[in-house]
């Protein structure tokens, strides 16, 4: 598994529009470094998800 310093995503659904709208739906202890809109739960360990919408998917983390 890659670290969160490298932007990566295992689950990234995209719309069929042109350009596509993609969103990483991975839930991790923190968001990857390229994430601009990261929301985390207050649980321990935290569960974080990046809510950015891009026109591409990052490489797989695993």
UniProtKB/Swiss-Prot annotation:
GO terms for cellular component: extracellular region. One of its GO terms (molecular function) is serine-type endopeptidase inhibitor activity. Coiled coil: none annotated. Disulfide bonds join 8-61, 9-24, 12-57, 14-22, 31-38, 35-50, 40-48. InterPro entries: Bowman-Birk_prot_inh, Prot_inh_BBI. Belongs to the Bowman-Birk serine protease inhibitor family. Forms a monomer at protein concentrations of below 1 mM. At concentrations of above 2 mM, self-associates. Inhibits trypsin but not chymotrypsin. Inhibits the trypsin-like proteinase activity present in larvae of the crop pests Adoxophyes orana, Hyphantria cunea, Lobesia botrana and Ostrinia nubilalis. This is Bowman-Birk type proteinase inhibitor. It comes from Medicago scutellata (Snail medic).
């Amino acid at each position: 598994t890659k670290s969160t310093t490298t932007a990566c995503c295992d689950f990234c659904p995209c719309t069929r529009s042109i350009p596509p709208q993609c969103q990483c739906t991975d839930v991790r202890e923190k968001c990857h470094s390229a994430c601009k809109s990261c929301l985390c739960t207050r649980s321990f360990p935290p569960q974080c998800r990046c809510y950015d919408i891009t026109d591409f998917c990052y490489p797989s983390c695993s």
